[in-house]
Structure formats: structure tokens, C-alpha cells
Amino acid sequence: MNRKWEAKLKQIEERASHYERKPLSSVYRPRLSKPEEPPSIWRLFHRQAQAFNFVKSCKEDVHVFALECKVGDGQRIYLVTTYAEFWFYYKSRKNLLHCYEVIPENAVCKLYFDLEFNKPANPGADGKKMVALLIEYVCKALQELYGVNCSAEDVLNLDSSTDEKFSRHLIFQLHDVAFKDNIHVGNFLRKILQPALDLLGSEDDDSAPETTGHGFPHFSEAPARQGFSFNKMFTEKATEESWTSNSKKLERLGSAEQSSPDLSFLVVKNNMGEKHLFVDLGVYTRNRNFRLYKSSKIGKRVALEVTEDNKFFPIQSKDVSDEYQYFLSSLVSNVRFSDTLRILTCEPSQNKQKGVGYFNSIGTSVETIEGFQCSPYPEVDHFVLSLVNKDGIKGGIRRWNYFFPEELLVYDICKYRWCENIGRAHKSNNIMILVDLKNEVWYQKCHDPVCKAENFKSDCFPLPAEVCLLFLFKEEEEFTTDEADETRSNETQNPHKPSPSRLSTGASADAVWDNGIDDAYFLEATEDAELAEAAENSLLSYNSEVDEIPDELIIEVLQE
């Protein structure tokens, strides 16, 4: 008995000694003294769509992050939490330092860049100078095309360069200005970088940047100082925060040497000697994963840090650390709605439609002025149309903007100007309808200067149940279930007979047995299993290499 007790006591002493040397990580708990701290929400998902559905059904202000699991396999799991709780663990836990912000589709966002080139393939390239010239060029484009004033002091400059690769992230911190979404950011950059893209298509080797011991030959003069005018290259200047170029004139003017800026410094070579742009134009896609400040790619040691030549400094606060301020500034989709916020748009060059699109009826027909389509929630669009189609007035949706952090849809209304503040219609100023999907309410605001000065906001009115997110998700799930039941029913009646949709494709009998549907289900199930295994083996399991306490043990201790 004594021996057992002594052995037990020894185990306890060893465990106590271990935790004295390596104490358990503290747990995030919002404090009453800081009411701005959100409640704890920490959910992991194997699929990105599941994570976004949870965010949309959650009342709290939560966001989606992607976490790399294993080296080389590209698998990621998705974390949903608040910025505050994420930063609480992120700043101290090594197994979280391979994270990405998921930039939500259709969400208002900041202007951002991913810059890189191979150092051995470009021995004369001066990366710092290239970044400075690019920032100056983009600032001039923003000023001429949109009337937005900015400088290098408004650009957060992050670096993760190695001996092999120069790598930077730039995130513009524009004052009361953001882009409609990252697709519009990509359109804007493709237009202003067209002269550099033209160089890539040139067969003349002389057009490629020559490298010398002092850098590229064109570094002596910034392109923004060469007398170049964007208004000449792009035939229409910004009107009401949007602009569209005439493609024929663009080609004609783009071919004129005197009207094109010298962007040869943006053309670099890869390790195969092929030309490509210093600016990665592939990062402006739906639900893009963009690496976080202080994160490295899994298997790599170099994280994104603030550069020595960074000129942006966040506003200091007594309650918030500088590091947390930099983190919040680095988030591309961290944009809040305000009455003074301007939304910039840019349509692709091949789009011949001009102007802002608005819906002219509750039906499906769309009258296009600028080429915008439905919001992410068409049911909400139709509800808003019902609000502005009454009393003999046929109002429309001039445009919409989606603010992901608040799950807020902001509709600019046209042809309907009735304002609750003055009890009548404005003579010349339009109104806005704002739909708060988290709180399931809608309200009206104004573009009228007097209403803006009063910070007018109408009473909140409840949304109809059929346009609330929980109802929409339930309806979607029921539709998916019914579709699956119908498929199983058809297979039960005659498992060897192809459905009409399959017959319409002209598939043979052999093709029916190997039509790819079972394979799709099999691949999906396999992917789920692999993701679950990856999550279990990497993020959720004990990592002996970094010698951290596993999440399960923390939860077990808290429960005890």
C-alpha cells in the first residue's frame, strides 16, 4: 500500500514539476472590465463552406481563418473565431503560426498586393526600390482615377524574404475608402498594370529588364513622375466611385509609347528564365486564403513581419498593443461600414456594359447601368425591392455592398427617395436600405447632407422569416436532402436504369455503370476522411516538436 502511495506521489510531483517548467496556456476569458471583448467562440471545420455557414448563422462578430495541416499536402482546416480570441492564442501558440485569412467572396475589402521574385534569377533587382516605385505608381492611379489621396505612409509593408526569394505583402490603409470586393481589386490592378502585361507578351528581348550591379536601368525616375496621365490612358475618369475604360481606345492609347508609363521594373524572371510580373495577379479570387501577419508557410521558418522600410504606423491606444493593431491592419477584409465610407469599383475591360446595375422589378429581369448582378442573397434583394416598389413608384437597387464582419448588406436605392427623417421624399438625394442579417432587422439611412449631419438612422424593422439566414440555410438543407432522397428512390426502383438526365447525355450502358457520380461521392468521403485525419494528427493532437500542451488536455483540466 505504501509503495503504491509513494509511486502515486512521485507521479504527482513529476507532473507538478513539469507544469512549473512549462505551465498550461492561459485560456481566453472576456472580462467584465472590458465590455468590448467578445465571448469565446472557437470552432473547427473540415470544409470552408461549413465554416462560412456557421459564421452567417452566428450572432457574434466571427471570422474564418485557414490553418495548414501537413507539409506538402496542401490540406487546410478552417477555424471560426473572433479577432480578439484568435489573437489571444495566436501570439503565444506555435502550432497556430501557419494561418491564412479567408477573404470572403463579395465582401468589401482593402487594396492588397502579393509581391515576389526569385533573387538568383534577378541578381540586379533592387526589391525595396521596386516596392517604393510600385506604391508611388498605385497612389497616383488612385488619385487620378478615383480622387483618393494616399502615400507610402498609408501602406502596411510586410516582408517574408529569404536568400532565394524576395517576398512582400502590401495592404493599403485608405482613409474611408475600400473596394467592393477583391475581384474589383484585381480588375483595377490589371488595368493600371496593362503596360507591364504588354511587356510580357513582347517577343523583343530588349523589352525585358536588364540587370546591372546597381539595379534596373529605369529606377532613376519613378513612373509617376514621367508626365504620364491615367486620364489619357483610361478614357473615362471615375464618376461616383467607379470607372470603366473603353477597350478600343485603351488598346489604341496603350500602344502609343508617349502615353504609356514605363513599368519595365515590374517585369522579372523566374528560375527558368521566363518573364512574369513582380505583382502576383492570381491572389484576387473568391474566398482567397491570404497569409497572416507573423505566419509562415508550413515547413518554412520565415514569417511575415513588418519591414524596416515600412512607413505605416497604426494609431496607438492604451488598451491595445501595437502588435495587435498591426494584426488588425493587416486583415484585408477588416472593413467596417460607415456613412463616410466610399466604395471603389472597377469592371473588367471585356465587359461592355457600363454603369451601375439595378433591379427594376421584383421579378428576375435586370436593367443594367453598370453591370452589377445579384447580391449573395437574392431573396433579400427581392425583399428590398418590395420595400421600394409601392405607392405607384417603381424604385430599384442601384448597387449593393456586402460587409462581411457585420453580415451587413447596404443597398443604394434609385427612383425611390422617401425618407423617414423628413416624412417625405427627398427632391434630389437618394436613400439607402441596410439589412442587418445577424440581428435580422432592416433600416433606412440617407445620402442627404442634412440627414448625414444628424447621423440619421430610421427605426429598425424585423426581417420576414423567409429572408432570415437560419430559414435560408434550413431551406437549402431540405432541398439538398430531398434531392438526395429522390436520387436514392430512383436507384431503389431500378438501380441499373439511368435517370432521364443521364439518358439525355447519350451515355452508353457501360457509361451508366461508370458515370462518375459514385466516384464523386467516394472522392468526397475520402477527402473528408483525410481532412479529419490531418486535423487530428496535426492541429488537435499533441505536438512533441514544439512541446506544447494539447487542446484536449486543456479542456480536460478546465472541466475538472
Swiss-Prot record:
Annotated binding of Zn(2+), by residue? C419, H426, C446, C451
Q: Which segment of this protein is annotated as the motif RPA1-binding motif 2?
A: 548-556
The segments labelled Disordered in the record are 203-223, 480-507
Give the consequence of mutating Y89D.
In MYP22; reduced DNA polymerase and DNA primase activities; reduced DNA-binding
Q: Where does substrate bind?
A: R76, D114, L115, E116, K165, F166, S167, R168, H169, R288, N289, F290, R291, K297
Biological process terms from the Gene Ontology for this record are:
DNA replication, synthesis of primer; error-prone translesion synthesis; mitochondrial DNA repair; mitochondrial DNA replication; R-loop processing; replication fork processing; response to UV; translesion synthesis
Q: What is the effect of changing Y89F?
A: Does not affect DNA primase activity
Substituting Y89S results in: Reduced DNA primase activity
Give the source's domain of life in one word. Eukaryota
Q: What is the effect of changing H426A?
A: Abolished zinc-binding, leading to altered translesion synthesis
Alphabetical list of Pfam families matching this protein: DNA_primase_S (PF01896), Herpes_UL52 (PF03121)
- Can you quote the record's cofactor note? Can act both with Mn(2+) and Mg(2+) as cofactor in vitro, but Mn(2+) is the preferred cofactor in vivo. The polymerase activity incorporates correct dNTPs with much higher efficiency with Mn(2+) than with Mg(2+). The fidelity is slightly more accurate when Mg(2+) is the cofactor compared to Mn(2+). In the presence of Mn(2+), a conformational transition step from non-productive to productive PRIMPOL:DNA complexes limits the enzymatic turnover, whereas in the presence of Mg(2+), the chemical step becomes rate limiting.
Residues with PTM Phosphoserine: S255
**Location of this chain's protein in the cell:** Nucleus; Mitochondrion matrix; Chromosome
Keyword presence, DNA repair: yes
* Sequence ranges of Polar residues compositional bias: 490-507
Q: What is known of its domains?
A: The zinc knuckle motif binds zinc and is required for the DNA primase activity. It facilitates the binding and selection of the 5'-nucleotide of the newly synthesized primer and the recognition of preferred initiation sites.
- Which disease is this protein implicated in? Myopia 22, autosomal dominant: A refractive error of the eye, in which parallel rays from a distant object come to focus in front of the retina, vision being better for near objects than for far.
For this chain, the family text in UniProt reads: Belongs to the eukaryotic-type primase small subunit family.
The UniProt subunit note reads as follows: Interacts with RPA1; leading to recruitment to chromatin and stimulate DNA primase activity. Interacts with SSBP1. Interacts with POLDIP2; leading to enhance DNA polymerase activity.
Q: What does this protein do?
A: DNA primase and DNA polymerase required to tolerate replication-stalling lesions by bypassing them. Required to facilitate mitochondrial and nuclear replication fork progression by initiating de novo DNA synthesis using dNTPs and acting as an error-prone DNA polymerase able to bypass certain DNA lesions. Shows a high capacity to tolerate DNA damage lesions such as 8oxoG and abasic sites in DNA.
Q: What is this protein called?
A: DNA-directed primase/polymerase protein
